[in-house]
Amino acid sequence: MCFERNTPLCMVVFILLVFCFFTDLIGFAIPYWYKADYNASGIMIISYGGLWEFCKESIHNTSCVNWVDDGFAGWFHAVRTFSTLSWIFSLSSLILVVLFFFYDRAMMYLASVCLSVIGAFCSLTSFLLYAVESSGDQKKFYSAFTLTITAFLLGLTAGVVGIIDFLLHFGDRERH
């Protein structure tokens, strides 16, 4: 089968990229980048939101609305953009490493690894920008924010392991 000729580190990169893709996708999509609790007329209200949706929850009901692009600060658009790019790069990297299993082209593997690192830095930019710009608010960072940090770490680790693997095993093959 196609996996037999690949190195163990290549399989580690593949597994890291799968987890990176799914953590990035979930962090990108769910409305849990922040959570805030406040008391309104004796009723405890919990609000939470992400890049695309905002929700309010009380004992009586929960309502969610999609964010409308009007009136957002430029930094929030930048966070959305870098999160979107991160997700696209992690998907592209995963597709290329799967194609590498079938076509065994070292440059395809190297491109996958490079896209993983680029996606990781897009993820880093998005969560750092969000953290810096919303640090004065009475919000607590929540699970999707943590998933974005996890996706950054997984993507960067996959990139570093992949570059090491490429230099150890595939670099000689490309020179001959």
Predicted regions and their residues:
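Interfacial non-cytosolic loop connecting adjacent transmembrane helices
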Residues: 63-67, 71-74, 131-148
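Short, highly charged, low-complexity non-transmembrane loops/tails of multi-pass membrane proteins
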Residues: 174-176
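A surface-exposed beta-alpha-beta supersecondary segment
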Residues: 24-80, 97-98
